[in-house]
Amino acid sequence: MEHTYQYLWIISFVTLPVPMLIGMGLLLFPVSTKKLHRIWAFPSVLLLSIVMVFSTDLFIQQINSSSIYQYVWSWTINNDFSLEFGHLIDPLTSILLILITTVGILVLVYSDSYMSHDQGYLRFFVYMSFFNTSMLGLVTSSNLIQIYIFWELVGMCSYLLIGFWFTRPIVSNACQKAFVTNRVGDFGLLLGILGLYWITGSFEFQDLFEIFNNLIYNNDNEVHFLFVTLCAFLLFSGAIAKSAQFPLHVWLPDAMEGPTPISALIHAATMVAAGIFLVARLLPLFVVIPYIMKLIALIGIITVLLGATLAFAQKDIKRGLAYSTMSQLGYTMLALGMGSYRAALFHLITHAYSKALLFLGSGSIIHSMEGIVGYSPDKSQNMVLMGGLTKHVPITKIAFLLGTLSLCGIPPLACFWSKDEILNDSWSYSPIFAIIAFSTAGLTAFYMFRVYLLTFEGHLNIYFQNYSGKKNSAFYSISLWGKQGSKILKKKMRLLPLLTINNKNNNERASFFCFFWKKIYQTGGTVRKMTCPFITINHFGTKRIFSYPQESDNTILFPMLVLVLFTLFIGAIGIPFNQFNKEEMNLDILSKLLIPSLSLLHQNQNESVDWYEFVTNSTFSVSIASFGIFIASSLYKPIYSSLQNLKFLNLVAKKGPKRILWDKIINVIYDWSYNRGYIDVFYTISLTEGIRRLAELTSFFDRRVIDGITNGVGFTSFFAGEGIKYVGGGRISFYLLLYLFYVLIFLLISSSIFSSFSSL
């Protein structure tokens, strides 16, 4: 086992050969590499699967041994300073390794089909593999310098993936916004790291915690206390930006302009979890500063409520899920601020799998809509144009419904167990925070079921909208950089998630991973036999276009079905009561795993809850969630529209001033949500316009004042020279006499000054 831990640093770089080999292939054999580009999905998945196997073994060893391992290599620069690099293996690391690898593998398999139509397929897998390498390096880092290096690499990969289709102006603006917003937090993180090193003289976590605690408990110097509090806040600012917490949350909804698999991996399960990971890693440092813990809880509860309210009126399905991510990560941050370390990590796990399922489900929905509206994110992601998809994409519908119920906190799905634990802990921390947290649980159920009902219930609304898309627009090609082309396909084709064209070989599979699932499905007379289980893929002619959405292929559906299993059963690892537990059986796996971390935080390791007490406490939260679902069903289910047409109900609804007041309240809430709480507008006016006006003022000062002085001296010399040249008469003797006269005056002045100094 010692050798396993000693060489575990290798797992951070196992996935690195994929981008290197793709780069070498494009350099040495560009034609063959591009022609065989689909095979690169296999090594990407294979290498990450190897990492997952080792991570699972590590997870089991951590449960059995309950210990922390750290290996460090020192690079001595001089006698006073040395850099140390290594890896730290503890429960937090093992949890994040499992999370990154499992979700990463499923997203890579999903992406093989989802991105099959895109000419940037190779570039996509290069970015994804490098991102996985960066995240694995981040969670295994043993000191703050290593964390910062991989932190920046993760940010770079996020920038590249958000801007994957950068020829679209809205995409380039989105990746720039994400980059600049994260730079604010990253700059604070760097200052905090340098400040802590100046105080403690170390970057290593163990040394840092010990020295920091001694400094807080043994030193009454207020200057030091204020400085360490400032450093802790600067460290926390990095987590605020990375995890999209208020007030640096504005980049996350715009980041949805990237491909949907990116949203599932980076902006739901892993990268936004990096901020939570940083706070959890540094919690022994934060916990000795009460002001910072209160600030973490305050930021968390504000983000919980803000994210929920901003999700109310979103029309874009991915942006609605983005605000949901923001709100749920706020719950996790709230738990960390309250000191509920176990509940925070539990919710991080359950939310990651549930939200990854929802994002992959939204990608399946978007692909099915692209068969009708073409490559147009404004249309294919617009829930206003959806509806009635239940009978067209039944498997996606079931998966999406389970993810929605989990996020709403409905038992026995994953998020119920973790969210309920956070809600119960909030009562003992602050009644005000508890009221907000419980209320937001109802709001979460409302806006998530709003998304579900608008998407799957009723009728396909695109046929009832003023939609002016061209008939052939569904068959646009996608350029290398994601730009919509004008090329119309003129050959017979198979409609895959978007397009996969090959007429010569009818046995060509939908994606690389279809090779592993062979089954023939016989369909109608005009349709040929195809290889793929969950759906029937047709060959269509030139002008043929889908009238209704079609279910996605097996490569897209398989990862979703695996995530359904996680959503159903992952909550079992943290069931908080052990009433039926015998001496040889321990149901609460998570608490057993976190024993070393809880010991470091001096928290109680045996927090088993009586099952009757748990059911009593959870009944209230489930009732609130059920009420939110009921309100959403009342407002958005098709039966409501039918009832509204009844004359009697219309008379009652429109009767009296209460209806007018209600409409005004609804409009205010809608405007608040649709305009993102006016926070983006505030930043645009106060920061963007302020910086622009400051730049204009600086430019005016530079051109008018600085350049004016310089140009003024030049103009003065020019005109003085022009005036003087007319004084002389053109005789050289006169010029010599005038020159000698000026020299004589200069000597007299110099001698008088020298004599006055010598007399002193």
From Swiss-Prot:
Keywords, ordered alphabetically: Chloroplast, Membrane, NAD, NADP, Plastid, Plastoquinone, Quinone, Thylakoid, Translocase, Transmembrane, Transmembrane helix, Transport
| A Gene Ontology cellular-component term | chloroplast thylakoid membrane
Q: What is its EC number?
A: 7.1.1.-
Q: State one molecular function term (GO).
A: NADH dehydrogenase (ubiquinone) activity
Q: Which reaction does it catalyse?
A: a plastoquinone + NADH + (n+1) H(+)(in) = a plastoquinol + NAD(+) + n H(+)(out); a plastoquinone + NADPH + (n+1) H(+)(in) = a plastoquinol + NADP(+) + n H(+)(out)
Q: What does this protein do?
A: NDH shuttles electrons from NAD(P)H:plastoquinone, via FMN and iron-sulfur (Fe-S) centers, to quinones in the photosynthetic chain and possibly in a chloroplast respiratory chain. The immediate electron acceptor for the enzyme in this species is believed to be plastoquinone. Couples the redox reaction to proton translocation, and thus conserves the redox energy in a proton gradient.
Taxonomic source organism: Populus alba (White poplar)
Where does the record place it? Plastid, Chloroplast thylakoid membrane
On subunit structure and binding partners, the annotation says: NDH is composed of at least 16 different subunits, 5 of which are encoded in the nucleus.
Report the Gene3D superfamilies cross-referenced here. 1.20.5.2700
Q: How does it sit in the membrane?
A: Multi-pass membrane protein
The gene from which this protein is expressed is ndhF
The alphabetized list of GO BP terms reads: ATP synthesis coupled electron transport; electron transport coupled proton transport
Ligase recorded as keyword = no
Family the entry assigns: Belongs to the complex I subunit 5 family.
Residue spans crossing the bilayer: 9-29, 39-59, 89-109, 125-145, 147-167, 185-205, 221-241, 260-280, 282-302, 329-349, 356-376, 398-418, 429-449, 556-576, 620-640, 734-754
Q: What is this protein called?
A: NAD(P)H-quinone oxidoreductase subunit 5, chloroplastic
